[in-house]
């Protein structure tokens, strides 16, 4: 396994529309394992392949259990996802490994139902609500070249751009 480099905003790579996965082989399995290791090392709960430079329609989500621990057996590997149903609306404070240090409220569907494939190309259906539904939507957005900051109001977007400039200034002075 290997730690992969996470691509940060404003890299144009994050705007790439990811392609369908067609080869469910050992290479894909290794990529998924490396993504998981990278996500855990970065203290994230979700990671889309494009965030590590792989323009493939795959993502992983590993929510912590009540004890706060993320168990690998709980990791969802979602490949070639498609929304079947969506419903409700909720606001959720989101962050992103590609936009480190910035968190903001984003409106999302409260419930989603998706069809996807696992690492063995088996078709699965998943119904999700609350945090899992939010994470699924956030990561699928990445597959379409969309970041959570794109969903902010103009006012919140300006706040984000200002904070980003401040952060970049601080990093230059280090």
From Swiss-Prot:
Residue positions of the active site: 139
Keyword Cytoplasm: no
Gene Ontology molecular function, alphabetical: metal ion binding; peptide deformylase activity
Binding site for Fe cation: 96, 138, 142
Cofactor(s) this protein cannot do without: Fe(2+)
Keywords: Hydrolase, Iron, Metal-binding, Protein biosynthesis
GO BP field: co-translational protein modification; translation
Gene3D superfamilies for the chain: Peptide deformylase
Note on cofactor: Binds 1 Fe(2+) ion.
Residues forming coiled coils: none
SUPFAM superfamilies according to UniProt: Peptide deformylase
Catalyzed reaction equations: N-terminal N-formyl-L-methionyl-[peptide] + H2O = N-terminal L-methionyl-[peptide] + formate
Keyword Iron: yes
The protein's Enzyme Commission number: 3.5.1.88
Primary enzyme class: hydrolase
Record-linked PANTHER family: PEPTIDE DEFORMYLASE (PTHR10458:SF22)
Family, similarity comment: Belongs to the polypeptide deformylase family.
Main function: Removes the formyl group from the N-terminal Met of newly synthesized proteins. Requires at least a dipeptide for an efficient rate of reaction. N-terminal L-methionine is a prerequisite for activity but the enzyme has broad specificity at other positions.
Xref: NCBIfam families: pept_deformyl, PRK00150.1-3
Name of the protein this chain belongs to: Peptide deformylase
Organism: Helicobacter pylori (strain HPAG1)
